[in-house]
Curated annotation (Swiss-Prot):
SUPFAM superfamilies per record: C-terminal UvrC-binding domain of UvrB, GIY-YIG endonuclease, RuvA domain 2-like
Family: Belongs to the UvrC family.
Domain GIY-YIG span(s) in chain numbering: 14-91
Keywords of this entry: Cytoplasm, DNA damage, DNA excision, DNA repair, Excision nuclease, SOS response
Job of this protein: The UvrABC repair system catalyzes the recognition and processing of DNA lesions. UvrC both incises the 5' and 3' sides of the lesion. The N-terminal half is responsible for the 3' incision and the C-terminal half is responsible for the 5' incision.
MF (Gene Ontology): DNA binding; excinuclease ABC activity
Protein name: UvrABC system protein C
Intrachain S-S bonds: none
Gene name in the database record: uvrC
Top-level taxonomic group: Bacteria
Presence of keyword Nuclease: no
GO biological process, one term: nucleotide-excision repair
Length: 590
């Protein structure tokens, strides 16, 4: 804990509000709310914490707080601050998933569409549906039952839907506004839960057609009834009151929280939503934040009623969302809550099993690697590899592994600038110098371990630059390969010595993954550069083809092979004069 934080902790008030944790770059990394700011914020810097909370605390270099007049005001402010800053440790709804809706468009001749975007365009929206397949199946059923227009744009003649009796063909025939209004009202009634009434009406029409010996017509009605049953009645009836409601329950353990949401539509459980995230404070407070974000971020429509557990502040949710909130004590609604809680508990159990397996491959591996190398646990590993063919187009690449996993946003590619010919040692010196000069200049995080895909010479070159030029003390190890180009040994120390690792150990497998990844990244970059060089060379010396036109041709065709397949006319279409295009075609065919 630094001096600035100590001084600020002493000034925290006994009032509700929000706090913003910041890292060394002054970036907001976590936002929280508290009933009493002094108690909540101080708790982060006292006592023991689990590993993930300790990781958060270790990154905090400063914090700010905003006092509010009430808990509900703090909750609303917290939601807005999370939206504004998108902190990396507020991960509960990062996917920002949107659900599909069925829309009746507001047009002269309306149509049905499935969409994830709800706009203020006077169209009628129904949903949300649990997935796009459910929405499409329902739309397909409605298309069979109600002959609204199907085409995005009205064609010049009738289409197949007209001949199937599924469209009135407003493209050719006059369809009145009254007819369209009646159809949209019928669809609206159906989507609002009136499909049982529609089914009864179809059954009556089927019976009437059968009595009148109109057997083909009766068969059509029978098929429509079957479509309704197969599409709308797959789910078991959960509640008989036909009220749309969302059921929330949660479970927490070992610093993680799982929230399960059951979507009840027209009395049926149609789908669920599962969210799992790290827990940094009391579960009931985290749940309040979750439920506020759930309806503000995920494009969810508020149902008529929400069911929540007894442990939750019901009044605060009602004030926040302006919706009817229930905490049932018995009966079918209570059973739904218990079922959601059971699912949340099972999901956490499954999560922990997967975490344990994953941690053995990642966190467990880096901890064992640190012990084997006699260094601190290398949470951040940066690995380097060179690539060239007899000194042409020399490049280097760096990959980053955080907590034993690749962090591709931080991968870097380097064109070698100061070295000529096949000089791996000189190339490594240049790249290490460029990388860590920038790290020092921009105050970026230093790695806990640097891995060099190479032997003693390259490791020594890297160490010389780090220690003697930049004054850095970072462990450097070399990844040595055997005759079959497989990870064989690890070099570290001064003087460099081989560290033996069990070949079937997780730390050895981790090194293999890192070595394979940095090699893949370097090779792919080198091939990319060679492809560009080959492309440039075949165009050299052609009159009228300068750097700009080379870039244009490369961007359009992508490779020499594809450009050789092009005609002068194809090249001319790029805005290149025909005469120049013909010269290019001739040069490529030589």
């Amino acid at each position: 804990m630094n001096k600035k934080i100590k001084e600020k902790l002493a000034l925290l008030p006994d009032q509700p509000g929000c706090y913003l944790m910041k890292d060394r770059q002054d970036t907001v990394i976590y936002v929280g709310k508290a009933k009493i700011l002094k108690n909540r914020v101080r708790s982060y810097f006292s006592g023991s914490h689990d590993a993930k909370t300790q990781r958060l605390v270790s990154e905090i270099e400063d914090f700010e707080y905003i006092v509010t007049s009430s808990n509900i005001e703090a909750l609303i402010l917290e939601m807005n601050l999370i939206k504004k800053y998108d902190p990396k440790y507020n991960v509960m709804l990062k996917d920002d998933k949107s659900y599909p809706f069925i829309k009746i468009t507001n047009e002269r001749h309306p149509k049905l569409v499935v969409t994830r975007k709800v706009k203020k365009d006077k169209g009628r929206y129904f949903g949300p549906y649990p997935n796009v397949q459910a929405a499409r199946e329902t739309k397909k059923l409605l298309d069979r039952l109600y002959p609204l227009r199907k085409c995005a744009k009205l064609p010049d003649r009738v289409c197949l839907y007209y001949h199937l009796g599924q469209c009135l063909a407003p493209c050719v025939y006059d369809v009145s506004e009254e007819t369209n209004r009646q159809l949209t009202e019928e669809i609206t009634r159906f989507l609002k839960g009136g499909y049982n009434e529609v089914k009864k009406e179809l059954e009556a029409k089927m019976l009437e057609a059968s009595e009148n010996l109109q057997f083909e017509r009766a068969k059509e009605f029978r098929d429509q009834i079957a479509h309704i049953e197969s599409t709308m009645e797959k789910q078991k009836m959960m509640l008989n009151d036909m009220v749309d409601r969302d059921v929330f329950a949660y479970s927490y353990d070992k610093g993680w929280m799982c929230v399960q949401v059951f979507f009840i539509r027209q009395g049926k459980l149609i789908e669920r939503d599962v969210s799992m995230f790290p827990l940094y404070r009391e579960a009931d407070e985290e749940f309040l934040t979750f439920i506020g974000q759930f309806y503000s971020k995920n494009n969810h429509f508020l149902p008529k009623e929400i069911l929540v557990p007894d442990s939750v502040d019901k009044d605060m949710i009602e004030e926040l969302l302006d919706v009817n909130v229930r905490q049932p004590k018995r009966g079918a609604k209570k059973d739904l809550l218990l079922l959601a809680h059971k699912n949340a508990k099972l999901a956490l159990k499954e999560k922990f099993s997967l975490i344990e397996r994953d941690e053995e491959r990642t966190i467990g591996a880096i901890e064992k690697l640190g012990k084997a190398l006699d260094i601190y646990t290398p949470y951040r590993i940066e690995a380097f590899d060179n690539s060239n063919i007899q000194g042409t187009d020399p490049v280097s690449a760096m990959v980053v592994f955080l907590d034993g996993k690749p962090h591709k946003k931080e991968y870097r590619k380097y064109k070698i600038k100061t070295v000529e010919g096949p000089d791996d040692y000189g190339s490594m010196r240049e790249v290490i110098r460029r990388r860590y000069t920038r790290v020092l200049k921009e105050n970026l995080p230093l790695p806990d371990l640097i891995l060099i895909d190479g032997g003693k010479g390259q490791v020594s070159a890297a160490l010389d630059v780090l220690e003697n030029e930049l004054g850095l003390d970072v462990p450097v190890a070399g990844l040595v390969k055997d005759d079959k180009h497989r990870t064989s040994n690890l070099l570290i120390g001064d003087p460099l010595e081989i560290v033996q690792l069990e070949r079937n150990s997780q730390e050895f497998y981790l090194l293999q993954r890192i070595q394979d990844e940095v090699h893949r990244f370097a090779i792919s970059f080198h091939r990319q550069l060679r492809g560009k060089s080959a492309f440039q060379s075949v165009l050299d010396g052609i009159p009228g083809v300068g750097e700009q036109r080379k870039k244009l041709l490369l961007k359009h065709f992508g490779s020499v092979k594809k450009m050789k397949e092009a005609s002068a006319e194809d090249i001319r279409k790029l805005g290149i004069p025909l005469k120049t295009a013909q010269l290019i075609e001739e040069a490529l065919k030589k």
